[in-house]
Amino acid sequence: MLSAFKCKNQNGGIPVKNVIIGQSGGPTAVINATLAGAYTEAVAQGADKVYGMIGGIQGLLNEKYADLSQYIIGDRECDILKQTPSAALGSCRYKLPNYEEEPQIYEKLFKILDKLEIFCLVYIGGNDSMDTIAKLSEYAKKIGSNIRFMGAPKTVDNDLAVTDHTPGFGSAAKYIAASVKEIICDSSVYDLKSVTVIEIMGRNAGWLTASAALAKDDDCCGVDLIYLPETAFDIEKCADKVKKLLAEKDTVVLAVSEALRDSNGEYVAASGSVYAGLDAFGHKIMSGTGQFLANYLGKTLGVKARGIEISTLQRSAAHFASKQDINEAVATGAAAVKAAFNGRTAEMSVIRRIFDNSEYVYSVETADIKSIANIEKTVPSEWIVNDNTYVSDEFIKYARPLIMGEMNIIYKNGLPMHLKIK
């Protein structure tokens, strides 16, 4: 059972060790499990207080934070937090400028951290969040601050370097594969020629789109074609392949990345609504690729065509999260805090894959943040096969262990319970 905090300054004169945890970027089904892991480890390490940033670094700059002990009262609340989707603390897409450009932001932030007597800051996020940790740790070193800055990985895109995979990917892959399997069943009901295009998230990395291949099993034929953003997309060549498949079967199902680009690097649906502006880090906000391609194939081939955008469901379906993913999310959060208490800073917790007699085993370590921040990991080219229209068995072996297991969900009035913070 989680115990109440005891101020160590009142019990032996040990310096205050307050911890603050933040969440940043797009949420996942298990980002709150990472928060739970970080929180419980901070309690176990004897932190005096554990704060949560409300709205990430941007919120902290506005002095928005909460004492997490007021919300995570015991094991039950912690378990509910683990099954809560989205980011319980709130998130942001705030690009921290370089110190030389706006030193006043750093000065303000460190003044707030000093006021809260923060010993360790843990930021749960993806590439851009690790960039924030790198900048803050560099500034701390520059001014001689003893605050430790640690990152914990999070992204459904699975594009973080060094770590074998990222918490959030396994649950999203599980939801995508199950949804694809069910869509294939639904699309084959009628005796008529049809095409279904399923659009899946992933800006430059096709890990999530590739996970559609996991649907194939003894009871499912699987998708017919998979198109990833790692390779150039030829819409006419795609139409030819679909036409040939329709000559052999009534229903063709495609899984496509939201960010397909042609050989010139242009988004294939640029004439439609493929993106709607930029986020704070200059990334295009995607949407519309699946519908654009469905419209094109329907018109070109003269068949019924439907575009399905799984959208935020793939990252928010916490009720269907992978147990393996949740366990690893908890472990990475705990590892980041433990490393800080062991004197580490400017690092991120990472997952190492270990194979023991073909059984999936993992360990959690930490790695230098500079080897991770602003580096993007994509699907290996040798895993993209069949003229760039499918993925190899190596991908299946890589991804399958990450979607295994289900949690025992706590329900209320027939629906999963969620923990509200803020």
Model regions and ranges:
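Short, Lys/Arg-enriched N-terminal segments with co-localized hydrophobic residues
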Residues: 1-15
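N-terminal phosphate-binding or glycine-rich loops at protein starts, especially the Walker A/P-loop
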Residues: 16-66
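Short, ordered loop/turn segments at secondary-structure junctions
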Residues: 24-26, 53-59, 93-94, 126-127, ...
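Short glycine/serine/threonine-rich phosphate/pyrophosphate-binding segments
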Residues: 28-38, 60-61, 105-107, 127-135, ...
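Accessory alpha-helical/coil subdomains and C-terminal extensions
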Residues: 50, 112, 120-125, 131-143, ...
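Glycine-rich oxoanion-binding loops at beta->alpha junctions
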Residues: 63-119, 128, 167-169, 181
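C-terminal non-catalytic interaction/assembly regions of soluble proteins
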Residues: 270-422
